[in-house]
């Protein structure tokens, strides 16, 4: 993938690794039993960074020879932007996973590719959708593993973004 993208992902990975070290130190220096939350959160973000690295490598294969892109590329690109804007600490990813499944369903109902180039392009898009699903599943699984005490301690924050009530798809659990 491009040098700029690769450097950005490498810098992100470095920051996340440092955050993991600091979260571990915080947990080791605290009497609060749920301080492992920060370490778990940073580890989940580090795993997501690895997925992003693979995703960037896949998307790099969509060079100029793949143009014009099929309509699926526009749709998945817009969805990627929506995920980037909404996947914050307090989002459990359930709604995003449902929406990704809806996109996949529409893709399956579409006509078969008309050329080898379109087939290969759509295969890369399918691979990208798989990576995005894995990224979202990492977040969903992190949230599912939270203890009630962690939810109360770390997610009952007054600065928590709006968009859901406890027990809803966009809420805390």
Predicted regions and their residues:
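Non-transmembrane accessory domains of multi-pass membrane transporters/channels
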Residues: 1-38
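Soluble C-terminal extramembrane regulatory/interaction domains of multi-pass membrane proteins
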Residues: 36-159, 173
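Polybasic, lysine-rich low-complexity intrinsically disordered segments
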Residues: 165-170
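Short, low-complexity, intrinsically disordered N-terminal modules
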Residues: 160-164
